[in-house]
Swiss-Prot record:
This protein's name: Transcription initiation factor TFIID subunit 5
WD repeat ranges per the UniProt record: 469-508, 542-581, 584-625, 626-667, 668-707, 710-749
GO biological process: mRNA transcription by RNA polymerase II; positive regulation of DNA-templated transcription; positive regulation of transcription initiation by RNA polymerase II; regulation of DNA repair; regulation of transcription by RNA polymerase II; RNA polymerase II preinitiation complex assembly
Source organism: Mus musculus
Alphabetical UniProt keywords: Nucleus, Repeat, Transcription, Transcription regulation, WD repeat
Subcellular location, record wording: Nucleus
Domain notes from UniProt: Distinct domains of TAF5/TAFII100 are required for functional interaction with transcription factor TFIIFB (RAP30) and incorporation into the TFIID complex.
UniProt main location, coarse: nucleus
CDD domains reported in the protein's UniProt record: TAF5_NTD2, WD40
SMART domains: WD40
Amino acid sequence: MAALAEEQTEVAVKLEPEGPPTLLPPQAGDGAGEGSGGTPNNGPNGGGGGNVAVAAAAGGDGGTPKPGVAVSAAAPAGAAPVPAAPAEAGAPHDRQTLLAVLQFLRQSNLREAEEALRREARLLEEAVAGSGAPGELDGAGAEAASALLSRVTASVPGSAAPEPPGTGASVTSVFSGSASGPAAPGKVASVAVEDQPDVSAVLSAYNQQGDPTMYEEYYSGLKHFIECSLDCHRAELSQLFYPLFVHMYLELVYNQHENEAKSFFEKFHGDQECYYQDDLRVLSSLTKKEHMKGNETMLDFRTSKFVLRIYRDSYQLLKRHLQEKQNNQIWNIVQEHLYIDIFDGMPRSKQQIDAMVGSLAGEAKREANKSKVFFGLLKEPEIEVPLDDEDEEGENEEGKPKKKKPKKDSIGSKSKKQDPNAPPQNRIPLPELKDSDKLDKIMNMKETTKRVRLGPDCLPSICFYTFLNAYQGLTAVDVTDDSSLIAGGFADSTVRVWSVTPKKLRSVKQASDLSLIDKESDDVLERIMDEKTASELKILYGHSGPVYGASFSPDRNYLLSSSEDGTVRLWSLQTFTCLVGYKGHNYPVWDTQFSPYGYYFVSGGHDRVARLWATDHYQPLRIFAGHLADVNCTRYHPNSNYVATGSADRTVRLWDVLNGNCVRIFTGHKGPIHSLTFSPNGRFLATGATDGRVLLWDIGHGLMVGELKGHTDTVCSLRFSRDGEILASGSMDNTVRLWDAVKAFEDLETDDFTTATGHINLPENSQELLLGTYMTKSTPVVHLHFTRRNLVLAAGAYSPQ
């Protein structure tokens, strides 16, 4: 048929000249049954057709639209509520809805559309021509009418359970155009919609609009019901308060009920948990519909479903309550904006729930932490270690040489047997060891033999590097693995590198001078260095914004820096110049880190994604997308097969480097995450955030296993000792704290029930695990590092109060 207006958008029903109308398929998720995998989509009344009022403004002569004429099929006033049950085929409100649509089509002279719809519904001509009486349908016609309505309802994105009869809810569609003659067959009907680009968007938005004066009553009624429930159900159902509050407030603002929205916010915002106060402050600034456009907080809530894990009996109790109260306003929000992960067994306590909630999108789904993770270490190559002078074979009193066992690399001996939890050696292509790498491993082994075994009775010494007069604003620090170099990123866009050993920093000679050097000499590596350039400090210029991240390569030949200018730069520590600028992030890059094996590195920034790079590729190899806010910190797993990211959405994610999939989502922090570190054996992960807590995670089972309380400000840095006995944490509260990691992880028994349900019981033993607290005068601790002999190096900029 001919289009009603050239500029109008297309409706979802295509009218063919022959046969019944072809409907678009239902949207994904419609019709899902109840189960533990998600939110059941059948409403509290079990489905069925609701009351529908179709308001149409048909154009008159000359194309001038007439005022909207409402053709309502609502139940008569005073009709008794229908009990909650699946609607029977051919129910009166089903027939009335179809008749209303058919009458509108007839008034608009859309004869072919009317005939096609009437044939499929098998309605009698007299019923349509009548004054709105239901008309008689045979059994097949009744089934067709019910099926047709359900299909039309399913085709609307975001459609939820319909309102029960008598509630007066309506779905309104506004049409305009010329009705001067019949439309041509085979065309697509067009609809002009006010203020929205398509009909489905209007319907979806209007479905969420209820009586603005009733929102407070709906929320208060649910709040009273939950508070009067049994203790076992109260803790479970209390999780609904925050997401329902946010979505009801956003609906009021979106539908321009500003006074009601303000009253609703002032009345109930104080009832929310304290760890949501930062989000509520942002939410309170959204007071007009125009404020919602482009607002990140609003987009997060509207585009991602808030995940709640609720005990099955508690969920059934909630569902029965909403059925009895005919509260479809709340039920629609539950369906459209929440993901209910139902579990069996036993309900969780308030403490267990509080330990896991707090993130921007709720808890993690159980399926998110079921993937197999190879957290074991790769087998190290065996390297022969030459004997030191003092270990050389001597002669005993009889003149016979002493018998000495040949030394092997302790690293190799530690991993002689393949760890069953380790990934295949060739799962990720890693760079081959160079001769210089082998020499460095030999030096590392020698240092290991002199390493102090730490414990509660043998705490490490701490050496603190204080940046004085750092008026450029220290923003990032890193130390090389052998503790010979320290780098700092500053707000004035510079990167500064210091030597912390007597050996000064030297640059390679110019090319003209290098051609004169004998390349066969034994000391060629010394000859190529220019002694005239020797100094304790080198300043690297290149960024055009503050430098927020720095990372040395394992071989100490390169340095990475990330900046507010959206780039990651690779610097040569032989020439102290920039080699490559990696451009991929669209916004500031908050952190970057090299792989333990070099070559690869990861970066994360304000654009909410982390990127995996290789030094010889100017484009990222992987993009890790999934966070709902800034990626503040990144960390490579010791086996280089995984990357951990901490975000301002208060979640930690573990990503598989092989395929880019997210294999773990950890929730529990109440503030943005700013520090991460893996245990040396690769099994555990420690995270720190602005809430001052340090959380410990079992990567294999995907569970929280510990909570360390003591810091009063953001935890900026975390490091395990070389053997994993001690965990050091540095904070903005000017303290370094040492924790007993062995005791925190000992007797860790994760049974099948805990693994399946996530019911964790965190011991309140922070004071027992705290081994020492070390105060600085007035210096926030920005970075921590354990030397190869287990000496702690800390760094920060002096900031007098």
